[in-house]
């Protein structure tokens, strides 16, 4: 019960962040590996930087409303920011058993084929960062990794408390149960254009990356988490598992760290360091 109440509060806080809205770029589409239609923003010119948003959000909420995408584009990069499968303008309401394994990571492989250009960097926040890890693992893309809002629990397949809370909220919403968590996730879906069925599928298709595989990563990696963010484990501990990875501490919780000005500043500094 406490976990569900906390989830409702977190989702409500995230909804308040929409007050910082800035206009997002128009969206384009591509056909993914299984012909699903995925929508994405494309803004700026320069080396490609893919931005992957968090669970139950969309690219606009995560990257454009806080102004992060615009700042990266202004720094001389081509920002590609998809609405991930089952979210926002990329609806996918198949039942969980019909979601392909690693679907969101495989969508990014199809995206790079569509663009005809490998990314200079892939950056993700929360679920987007988990997907960025999987994208690198499956493709062995040589671009940089910027991973926000995740820690060492992404390597622990048994650490499912957070997923369980989200799943319970979604199932309450689908069943019409009037719980605080269900109300919060329904409000979130309405605000971002998502669906509960899409969210449920995304949770079901999520795959962890065990520590022995993290140890094989050989690209520059930056880990960023808020000083009060332990939602996905320890950021410094994750950095210690990836060879050569660096850690930057932000101010805030899992949700509020995305509006810390230090986030885009650290991302741009990392991007520039490789040019």
Feature annotation, model-predicted:
Residues 217, 223-225:
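Short beta-strand/loop motif that positions the catalytic acidic residue
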Residues 56-68:
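The serine-hydrolase catalytic nucleophile loop
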Residues 118-155:
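Conserved hydrolase catalytic core segment
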Residues 102-119:
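Conserved acidic catalytic loop of the alpha/beta-hydrolase fold
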Residues 187-210:
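Hydrophobic, aromatic-rich cap/lid helix
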Residues 250-275:
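Catalytic active-site module of serine/aspartate enzymes centered on a nucleophile-bearing elbow/loop
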Residues 227-252:
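Conserved loop-alpha-helix segment in the C-terminal half of the alpha/beta-hydrolase fold
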Residues 72-91:
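Conserved alpha/beta-hydrolase
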């Amino acid at each position: 019960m406490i976990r569900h109440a906390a989830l409702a509060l977190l989702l409500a806080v995230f909804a308040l962040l929409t007050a910082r809205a800035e206009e997002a770029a128009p969206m384009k589409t591509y056909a993914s590996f299984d012909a699903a239609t995925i929508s994405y923003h494309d803004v700026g010119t320069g080396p490609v930087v893919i931005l992957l948003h968090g669970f139950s959000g969309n690219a606009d909420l995560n990257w454009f409303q806080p102004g992060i995408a615009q700042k990266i584009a202004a720094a001389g990069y081509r920002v590609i920011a998809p609405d991930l499968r089952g979210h926002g303008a990329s609806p996918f309401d198949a039942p969980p058993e019909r979601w392909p394994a690693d679907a969101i990571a495989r969508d990014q492989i199809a995206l790079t084929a569509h663009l005809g250009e490998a990314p200079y960097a892939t950056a993700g926040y929360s679920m987007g960062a988990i997907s960025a890890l999987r994208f690198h693992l499956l493709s062995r893309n040589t671009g940089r990794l910027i991973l926000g809002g995740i820690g060492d629990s992404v390597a622990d397949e048994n650490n499912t408390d957070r997923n369980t809370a989200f799943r319970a909220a979604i199932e309450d919403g689908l069943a019409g149960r009037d719980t605080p968590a269900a109300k919060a996730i329904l409000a979130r879906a309405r605000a971002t254009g998502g669906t509960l069925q899409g969210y449920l599928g995304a949770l079901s298709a999520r795959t962890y990356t065990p520590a022995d595989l993290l140890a094989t990563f050989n690209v520059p990696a930056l880990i960023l988490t808020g000083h009060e963010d332990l939602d996905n484990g320890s950021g410094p501990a994750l950095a210690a598992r990836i060879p050569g990875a660096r850690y930057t501490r932000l101010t805030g919780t899992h949700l509020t760290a995305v509006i810390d000005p230090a986030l885009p500043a650290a991302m741009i500094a990392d991007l520039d360091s490789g040019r």
